[in-house]
Amino acid sequence: MHAATDVTGFGLLGHALEMAQGANVSLELDAAAPALLSPRVRELARLGILPAGMYRNRHFAQARVDAGDVPRDVQDLLFCPETSGGLLISVAAADADALLADLLADGRVPDARVVGRVGEAGAAGGARIALR
């Protein structure tokens, strides 16, 4: 394992950015991978029913996030603060399948999945996140 954090008040993107900054790397995240993006949750986000912390998190991290064509409601949800989020764990790509198998083996972990990959820091320097 290279790094791990609990996804709480800074949301997935805020915590991912902190991890990337600590290692001076870039991250590419699959915006559709997190399980929280159900149609009902997305509809609430489209209606603007979002916690105030989402706006603070977006302000903190948006300059380092390339959202590409990811819809605004999905972006907002990835910035949303969580009070009891999951874990974000970074491992070597070669170790990912074994970690997933171990986590899911006995049923105590209800969900685990690959949500992105680590790359070198951007040409402009510093950590960045690209959403795909």
Task: State what each model feature region is.
Residues 1-132:
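Glycine-/charge-enriched secondary-structure boundary and capping motifs
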